[in-house]
Amino acid sequence: DTRNAHKTASGSYLVAHERDGVVREYDAKGSVIWEYAVPLFGRERAGGHSPEAFGNQLYSAVRLPNGNTLIGTGNGHSVIEVTPEKEIVWKLEQNDLDGITLAWVTQVERLPNGNTRLVNCHAGPDNPQIIEVTPAKQVVWTFHDFDTFGNSMPVALVLPAE
């Protein structure tokens, strides 16, 4: 399954292959020019979408201006930033945020101020659906409306106020 694809500034395409647990970058002719397999970090797979599940079924990947790739690891409950050499240089894990549990981390975005915004799907009624964090993993703000959206908010577009 392919969850989403983004065209990069260089004209290639960055594609999140959920079932394979791999981000692949394709050139304009469809040839793979880079790929990154999301690791299991020494853990065993556990099926499902809830916070108790675990795997590497990533949901999203975006290329950052510095050339690194920001990845929403899906049921890996994390956000990772990896270099072109495949080194993890930043990671937000399931229980890094005080009072918040990450579940199926879907859409991710690095904001111009350096903060990271992520969508936290399938996290249950006690956790926010959208979270913005600083590079130091401090929560800036959250959106939490389980009554309206439940566990079914895999993507969100947050626009600036006019």
Where are these regions (language model features)?
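Histidine-/acidic-rich catalytic cores in large beta-rich domains
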Residues: 1-162
